[in-house]
């Protein structure tokens, strides 16, 4: 009898510890190729007619709150982020799914789900799970292959552009030839003008110094 009582006393605390904690399961790893990912958190607790809070944290120490939802199952609550993440979500039967969009490569990290029962008392939350490593791959843009139907307008534009380019080249050559011909005629005309005889200009005359004529008759008288 005493042995049964001791076993019962040892059994009840273990039940209480289990009931005060929510077990959460997550996938160990997710690879993101298109900057979007859906992370599901499965829990073992009945949230019917209870106020709860489900949140997603980033980092080994869960320092960044990525996305959160508050409410109950009587209405569909809204998911939101106070740290700049583009997030949404959905509540299911024993599952909370977080939709993360527009993720960047530098947001590759480990993410933890946290489930809390806020009301009625007592407050219950989950044991910290192993988390999910979200690996965001760099997005490479591949050139789209043109279908035969969509390539027809492209080749039509190429043909029209080629014809216009050919006529533009002909016009440029013709204008260049006219310009060279005009320039050559101007050069020949200039050379002809330089070869015509010109009237010599006035020459400078050298005058002898003036000396008055002597009157020899005056000396004779």
UniProtKB/Swiss-Prot annotation:
Topology feature Cytoplasmic, residues = 175-221
Q: Where found in the cell?
A: Cell membrane
Q: What is its main location?
A: membrane
Q: Which Pfam families does this UniProt record tie to the protein?
A: V-set_2 (PF15910)
Can you supply one Gene Ontology CC term for this chain's record?
A: external side of plasma membrane
- Which segment of the chain is annotated as a signal peptide? 1-20
Instruction: Spell out the InterPro entries in the cross-references.
Output: CD28, CTLA4/CD28, Ig-like_dom_sf, Ig-like_fold, Ig_V-set
Q: Which residues lie on this side of the membrane: Extracellular?
A: 21-153
Modification after translation: Phosphorylated by LCK. Dephosphorylated by PTPN11.
Q: TM segments? A: 154-174
Name listed for the protein in its UniProt record:
T-cell-specific surface glycoprotein CD28
Q: Which gene encodes it?
A: CD28
